[in-house]
Amino acid sequence: MEDDFDIRDARMPENEREYENVLRPLSLRDFSGQAKVVENLKVFVMAARMRKEALDHVLLHGPPGLGKTTLSNIIANELGVGFKVTSGPVLDKPGDLAGVLTSLEKNDVLFIDEIHRLSPIVEEYLYSAMEDYRIDIVIDKGPSARSIQIDLAPFTLIGATTRSGLLTSPLRARFGINMHLEYYDMETLTKIVLRSANILNVKCELNAAREIASRSRGTPRIANALLRRVRDFAQVKGNGDIDKAIACFSLEALNIDRYGLDQIDNKLLTTIIDKFKGGPVGLTTIATALGEDPGTLEEVYEPFLIKEGFIKRTPRGREVTDLAYTHLGRSRVGEQGFLFD
């Protein structure tokens, strides 16, 4: 159905980026979840402020929507320094990187999203910038080419990635602070939903917030996106307030089931069962059958399905689990005959 809620749109909808910014916490004190990460960051940030130095370079990795960008912004706020944002695909050539780096002031924070997508040549230029706060720029071409060394102000690079396994060892080794973000528990997500509802000036009952949280795939960005959609239903179909009944009605209308799975999740599981006898089957083959990008399946959908026990990785490919069969109301081929073999 064309009007089904696509879980990918919940990760950072372009037309709702302003809402995402409004709902972001601005300090470590206001940040919910990731307790160990937050406590360690408080120490590292305080130490850098006491020494009046740039914070060591930080690598944040984990599934989409867990707060990597938000934490990066908070770090800059806590340090009281400037914050510049770019991404790996945007930094196409060394000159692009040089332009960003030379614009930084002392102890500023540079956030590079999707840092695993940096081109090899740009990544090499980044090494000396991270280690020695300098870059070497080649002027002219051919016999007249010469290298000019440019000194940079001390800065903190925060790299964010959903696929840390794609980072090269030399780049990974240059991050002094390495932090993995985990999926959120329901209690924390419920607090986030209630906080966001308050900011959006909409009344949301505790049970309704729990219902939204339980279907948010452990991801704050999805919880906030679902809250905004439920708010729409509450205004049009109800009195504007969000209770459990309107929350359940809205989420069912969006085809988000009680596990937080959407239409593509269920289609993925069904495809493995119907076309590949439950697996094992390779990711590229699954992607072709679904008409989806393999990277999208691996980065966006698969982590949650694995975490919740619907699929598992094996040396021969992906397999669906008994939980997936039960969830879809299906039985394994030949299952009833086992007793009579």
Swiss-Prot record:
Signal peptide: none annotated. Residues 3-184 are annotated as: Large ATPase domain (RuvB-L). Keywords: ATP-binding, Cytoplasm, DNA damage, DNA recombination, DNA repair, DNA-binding, Hydrolase, Nucleotide-binding. Residues 185-255 are annotated as: Small ATPAse domain (RuvB-S). One of its GO terms (biological process) is DNA recombination. It is found in: Cytoplasm. Its main location: cytoplasm. Mg(2+) binds at residue 69. Its EC number is 3.6.4.-. InterPro entries: AAA+_ATPase, AAA_lid_4, DNA_helicase_Holl-junc_RuvB, P-loop_NTPase, RuvB-like_N, RuvB_C, WH-like_DNA-bd_sf, WH_DNA-bd_sf. It catalyses: ATP + H2O = ADP + phosphate + H(+). DNA binds at residues 313, 318. Pfam families: AAA_lid_4, RuvB_C, RuvB_N. One of its GO terms (cellular component) is Holliday junction resolvase complex. Residues 258-341 are annotated as: Head domain (RuvB-H). One of its GO terms (molecular function) is four-way junction helicase activity. ATP binds at residues 23-24, 65, 68-70, 131-133, 174, 184, 221. PANTHER family: HOLLIDAY JUNCTION BRANCH MIGRATION COMPLEX SUBUNIT RUVB (PTHR42848:SF1), PTHR42848. Belongs to the RuvB family. Has 3 domains, the large (RuvB-L) and small ATPase (RuvB-S) domains and the C-terminal head (RuvB-H) domain. The head domain binds DNA, while the ATPase domains jointly bind ATP, ADP or are empty depending on the state of the subunit in the translocation cycle. During a single DNA translocation step the structure of each domain remains the same, but their relative positions change. Homohexamer. Forms an RuvA(8)-RuvB(12)-Holliday junction (HJ) complex. HJ DNA is sandwiched between 2 RuvA tetramers; dsDNA enters through RuvA and exits via RuvB. An RuvB hexamer assembles on each DNA strand where it exits the tetramer. Each RuvB hexamer is contacted by two RuvA subunits (via domain III) on 2 adjacent RuvB subunits; this complex drives branch migration. In the full resolvosome a probable DNA-RuvA(4)-RuvB(12)-RuvC(2) complex forms which resolves the HJ. The RuvA-RuvB-RuvC complex processes Holliday junction (HJ) DNA during genetic recombination and DNA repair, while the RuvA-RuvB complex plays an important role in the rescue of blocked DNA replication forks via replication fork reversal (RFR). RuvA specifically binds to HJ cruciform DNA, conferring on it an open structure. The RuvB hexamer acts as an ATP-dependent pump, pulling dsDNA into and through the RuvAB complex. RuvB forms 2 homohexamers on either side of HJ DNA bound by 1 or 2 RuvA tetramers; 4 subunits per hexamer contact DNA at a time. This is Holliday junction branch migration complex subunit RuvB. It comes from Parabacteroides distasonis (strain ATCC 8503 / DSM 20701 / CIP 104284 / JCM 5825 / NCTC 11152).
